Amino acid sequence: MVDTTIPGIARRYLQRLVSLGVVVERGVIFGSHARGEASKWSDIDLIVVSPRFDAPRTRDDINLLWKAAVREDSRIEPIPCGSKEWLEDKTSAIVEIARREGKELAP
């Protein structure tokens, strides 16, 4: 059964990132929540697509994603993905799975 609260949680998280200065093109929920197989213990797998992440990612970028996640909902597992990477990458298994099964969200 799909938890209908998850997209709202993810959108609020993306909006929090925007308020912190991150240009977010989209979020993509994938994994058990996208497949409708989540349990109450499932995390929220969320790709954050931003041109900011096309450049080499810094520890500060990763810390920002995780700190915002903890403040919104500790189940969020943010994964940074560059805009170009989202469109063109053919080597990342996670990106490929998210493209195939993911549910896209606008921030």
PLM-predicted stretches and their roles:
Residues 45-48:
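Short beta-strand->loop micro-motif that forms the acidic, two-metal-ion catalytic signature
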Residues 1-26, 35-40, 51-107:
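Catalytic core of pol beta-like nucleotidyltransferases
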Residues 30-32:
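Glycine-rich beta-strand-to-loop/alpha-helix junction loops that act as flexible
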